């Protein structure tokens, strides 16, 4: 059965990499596989009794993560007592459909392809699939997929929960995420190692209908185009983990959704280009693509502690949406030649109103790098609790509206002439460093205090395409909504 290349997959790749700038348009590849009807599962053993070896493996995993860190797992680290395989297009290897199921110490191999939206939205062709309010507890697993639209572990629908720990996941096909959550499902993960190599294959991924994702510990790596480590149309929290992308952004947040990173080490090397919609690369992209997969509204990106290392381009890029960026004690290193923050129009939304509206809250934070806010964008920058900002804002002249508020004990050192709209600061908090600062066209006098007014942020609200509850018998995904 020849795999089809879906509109959704191509749009997904474009969304993840177009604004981020990346070199020739790439879509999911076609291939052939054995045919079969969708929806059946091939689990040979749904629960197992711990053996001595299994207990030792569990103990080692616990010890490895006791100090808040976790071991980078390989296949050989996990004791395997059972193997489950499925090569049929559209089918699953393990399914929990409205039931509670426990699976451990199992190798899961999934090949076969899917045509697209049914896999991305509703879980078709996933190796492991939970739906209809089912609960699936997984531990000490090895999960490998090799097919187009072959996600590894999928939680779909309100009331559905997947808990997975101390496991190794690998996907090698295009449009094949590691952890996938849609339709309001819940995914809880601890101490995983996930490697994805296909295009449009985020390690931690959500899609239409979103949900809640909690990840603690582990190593999550992507190497394909349009494959950030995290792609969020949900509320995703990651703590004490290592995230690495070698071709795409590190994090993408779309629409009215959020990503929170607690003590996370994130490295992003966005060095590939799929479209001419933008000429920028970045580590973190926050946007609204207007595909309907994410509701419109204010998003957020929060980073508490940890490190963010950007290898190429800008650190943050915000387009066609309003967002809060909250940074608290994070070490941010920009090793490329880009800037710290760019709020600007790109290829999505209505021309003239598709910029970025950013509220940047810096708490005990060091910010090093320039900021650019184009004429259809705006920025409210708050420097709090001893934060320092070294850089220029709109050094080429006045463009979008910018408000800067500097709390007592925080400072701004200019590295170039800067143009802002309004300023609140105590005396002595700004070091012009030989440059000029213009506030609404008036040159600021170094050493003086100022009182200004924040920019009002206008947030457009609308719902995305929701995913229907439930599913067909035997864990098949439901039909797509007629909208």
Language model segments and positions:
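N-terminal segments that cap or nucleate solenoid repeat domains
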Residues: 52-120, 449-457
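Disordered, low-complexity segments in secreted/periplasmic proteins that are enriched in proline
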Residues: 28-67, 290-293, 349, 463-483
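C-terminal motif of bacterial Sec signal peptides marking the signal peptidase cleavage site
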Residues: 23-27
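Extracellular beta-strand/beta-solenoid scaffold signature
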Residues: 65-67, 88-95, 116-129, 147-155, ...
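Bacterial Sec-dependent N-terminal signal peptides
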Residues: 1-15
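Post-signal-peptide, soluble extracytosolic/periplasmic N-terminal scaffold domains
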Residues: 97-105, 110-149, 154-173, 180-193, ...
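Extracellular beta-solenoid/beta-roll
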Residues: 334-336, 353-458
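All-beta strand scaffolds that present successive hydrophobic residues in beta-strands
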Residues: 73-82, 100-105, 135-140, 161-167, ...
């Amino acid at each position: 059965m020849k795999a089809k290349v879906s509109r959704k997959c191509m749009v997904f790749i474009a969304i993840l990499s177009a604004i981020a700038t990346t070199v020739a348009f790439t879509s999911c590849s076609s291939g052939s596989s054995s045919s079969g009807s969708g929806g059946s599962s091939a689990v040979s053993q749904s629960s197992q009794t711990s053996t001595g070896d299994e207990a030792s493996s569990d103990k080692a995993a616990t010890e490895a993560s006791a100090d808040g860190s976790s071991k980078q797992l390989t296949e050989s680290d996990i004791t395997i007592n059972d193997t489950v395989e499925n090569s049929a297009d559209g089918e699953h290897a393990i399914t929990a459909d409205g039931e509670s199921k426990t699976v451990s110490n199992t190798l899961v191999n999934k090949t076969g392809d899917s045509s697209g939206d049914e896999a991305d939205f509703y879980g078709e062709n996933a190796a492991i699939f939970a739906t209809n309010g089912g609960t699936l507890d997984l531990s000490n697993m090895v999960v490998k997929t090799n097919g187009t639209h072959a996600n590894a572990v999928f939680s779909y629908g309100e009331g559905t929960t997947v808990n997975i720990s101390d496991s190794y996941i690998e996907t090698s096909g295009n449009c094949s995420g590691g952890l996938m959550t849609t339709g309001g499902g819940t995914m809880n993960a601890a101490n995983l190692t996930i490697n994805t190599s296909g295009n449009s294959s985020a390690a931690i991924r959500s899609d239409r209908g979103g949900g809640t994702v909690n990840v603690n510990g582990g190593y999550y790596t992507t190497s394909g185009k349009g494959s950030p480590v995290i792609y969020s149309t949900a509320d995703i929290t990651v703590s004490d983990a290592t995230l690495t992308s070698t071709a795409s952004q590190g994090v993408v947040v779309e629409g009215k959704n959020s990503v929170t990173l607690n003590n996370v080490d994130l490295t992003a090397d966005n060095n590939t280009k799929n479209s001419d919609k933008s000429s920028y690369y970045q580590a973190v992209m926050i946007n609204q693509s207007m595909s309907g997969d994410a509701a419109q509204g204010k998003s957020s990106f929060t980073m508490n502690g940890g490190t963010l290392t950007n290898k190429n381009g800008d650190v943050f890029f915000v387009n066609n949406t309003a967002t809060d960026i909250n940074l608290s004690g994070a070490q941010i290193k920009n090793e490329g030649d880009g800037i710290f923050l760019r709020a600007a129009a790109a290829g999505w939304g209505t021309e003239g109103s598709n910029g970025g509206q950013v509220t940047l809250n810096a708490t005990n934070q060091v910010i090093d790098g320039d900021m650019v806010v184009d004429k259809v964008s705006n920025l409210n920058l708050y420097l709090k609790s001893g934060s320092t900002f070294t850089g220029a804002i709109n050094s080429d002249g006045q463009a979008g509206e910018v408000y800067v508020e500097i709390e007592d004990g925080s400072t701004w050192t200019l590295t170039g002439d800067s143009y802002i709209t309004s300023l609140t600061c105590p005396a002595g908090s700004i070091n012009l460093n030989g440059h000029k600062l213009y506030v609404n066209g008036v040159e600021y006098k170094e050493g003086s205090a100022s009182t200004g007014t924040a920019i009002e942020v206008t947030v457009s609200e609308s719902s995305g395409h929701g995913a229907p509850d439930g599913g067909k018998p035997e864990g098949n995904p439901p039909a797509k909504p007629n909208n």
